[in-house]
């Protein structure tokens, strides 16, 4: 039991970047992006939780390539996205893919 009724759980919720690739028009550029993006994300503390084509689509789902990356916080996820190493990876990707990319905060 806590000694103080004023103590709060200061744990920040984790954040997840979720990318779903609707179309891959240049696999070589995607490979160049992956070679740069993976190390940039991991160096910033990101953890790949899932990566690959969906095993099954339900309701209106699609069998797209999907990537889920966990970060310790929303701020860490956004700092990684905005970082110079990740921006270099995005430049290598160019317009090689059409994807839906979003950041979702976890439940604290």
Task: Place the predicted regions along the sequence by residue.
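C-terminal structural segments of small proteins and small subunits
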Residues: 77-102
